[in-house]
Amino acid sequence: MLESIDTSMVDWSRAQFALTAMYHWLFVPLTLGLAVIMGLMETLYYVSGNEFWKRTAKFWMKLFGINFAVGVATGLILEFQFGTNWSNYSWFVGDIFGAPLAIEGIVAFFMEATFIAVMFFGWNKVSKKFHLASTWLTGLGATFSAWWILVANSWMQYPVGMAFNPETVRNEMVSFASVAFSPVAVMKFMHTVLSSWILGAVFVIGVSAWYLLRKREKEFAVASIKIAAGVGLFAALVTAFSGDKSAYQVAKYQPMKLAAMEALYDGGTHEPLTVVGSLKIPEMLSYLATHDAAGYVPGINDLLLGGYTLPDGSKALSVNEKIEKGKVAIKALSDFRQAKEEKNEEGMQRARQMLDENMPYFGYGYIKDPNSIVPNVWLSFWSFRVMVGLGMYFILFFIVILFLSWKHQLSKASWLHWVALWSIPLAYIASQAGWVVAEVGRQPWAIQDLLPVNAAISRLETGSVQTTFFIFLIMFTVLLIAEIGIMLKAIKKGPEEVQ
């Protein structure tokens, strides 16, 4: 049923999915971040009755709506690719992967679609309390949608809660709770959503700083910056905390990804964390990976050759040994299906036992070159440092803003206004870099240790994938330019007077 395909179609299919995902992710974090900030602003309006906060909230809602609409359009195309370009993947794990996506579409999206209408068109038509609830429920719906998408992605990083059925050649869900609330999913949700709050906060601060540079809307801009900086600092600190927990999980479930992130070829105990070049933090990598400064961290060569001692006391297998076990599993699956056709119960039981024993290595049976399980080290290494470095910068950025706000110097610090304005693209770079680390570091696996990308794709002509790649590239670029143009027009117009 699953056959390894080693052609340029794999690379083009990966490139197309990466293009779609990265364009889509230009819009999602701003939606999540603005939802919280505009919700807080409308809450202040509800509590105080001050029309200033209504005017402020409505302005950011307008930008939220523009961004939300384009994000939905790009997201729909992204989900369709699982059926068009990755049909083997959809067949092999569709029963599991499809569940969170179905919940996201049926529950979360309709929740957003319902309450966003009230949020935009319900002013002066519904009560203040109901409108406030609609605003928060719109944001909650977007966050709930992100939860299920991240559950699906986390399952690809750490597949749990399923059992392989050799009769259908599919993985079937046996524990919904294990899939929905796996430790990887919880940490990924926290890290991703809170980092989106950072991006939303930086966006609000940057746009508000533009007004201060133009000496327009001073009260509106200062108030927006204060709220956004508070949200941003909280989010940045929690994101850093969740990043620490995520490092421990990566070391446990995806050690090759961690080794690539650190460009660590030969592991050991008391491993330092490389900042850049020869600048290292002593024993920090061992502590992050094992919660023990003296802990052993395997490097790329260790993971390829095996032989080191695992935490449970057993010896790690080499990749070649895993490949052999994977081939045994694939052969056992073939034997099982043949025995079933022949109605050979004894043969089925024997093949099933062999399959179960080697199933943890099933995906390795499609790996031809042991070195191919090493992801792009250069890209993983530098993407991780860009993400972490900018994360630390944003913590300092928010602290400086809150300090100047406390000193009542916020509107006078023109240097900071320029810094804030140019920090907007930095927030997007940090967000994209995080996904590069997560996805490039997982390669060559579509599902960690279970299904490599070369066995997950559809049988398509390379030319057709290339054609749709460039169609999507042009279409998404046009959408992005249109969104930026509409946003700039709304920003130049500024907040409207409350009617």
Regions found by a protein language model. Give the residues of each.
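Polytopic transmembrane helical bundles with strong interfacial aromatic enrichment
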Residues: 1-499
